[in-house]
């Protein structure tokens, strides 16, 4: 469950290391985002030679949350951290590698490229 001012790890090699959620996209009064949702975020920590710089406003898709997500079959899945992958206007990832496992729900939301780059899909 991600809301404004939540800080997330960046799970790709775009150059950003930590982002802070500014807005959850999808509805005027939408409060929370879960796995597979798109957020607008500000970059709080970044590598000095990366594509993304500190202070930049980016869009990102959430790939891991500490709050459990219920699946269609009734099972629950949760992760150790909150993480996101930075995307461009065409919903393609900016980075070329994804670090750590991602939830299967990301594929169902239409992010096949992110799923194919991930080392493990749970």
From Swiss-Prot:
One of its GO terms (molecular function) is large ribosomal subunit rRNA binding. Disulfide bonds: none annotated. InterPro entries: Ribosomal_uL14, Ribosomal_uL14_bac-type, Ribosomal_uL14_CS, Ribosomal_uL14_sf. Signal peptide: none annotated. Keywords: Ribonucleoprotein, Ribosomal protein, RNA-binding, rRNA-binding. It comes from the Bacteria. Pfam families: Ribosomal_L14. GO terms for biological process: translation. Gene3D superfamilies: Ribosomal protein L14. One of its GO terms (cellular component) is cytosolic large ribosomal subunit. The keyword Isomerase does not apply. Binds to 23S rRNA. Forms part of two intersubunit bridges in the 70S ribosome. Belongs to the universal ribosomal protein uL14 family. Part of the 50S ribosomal subunit. Forms a cluster with proteins L3 and L19. In the 70S ribosome, L14 and L19 interact and together make contacts with the 16S rRNA in bridges B5 and B8. This is Large ribosomal subunit protein uL14. It comes from Nautilia profundicola (strain ATCC BAA-1463 / DSM 18972 / AmH).
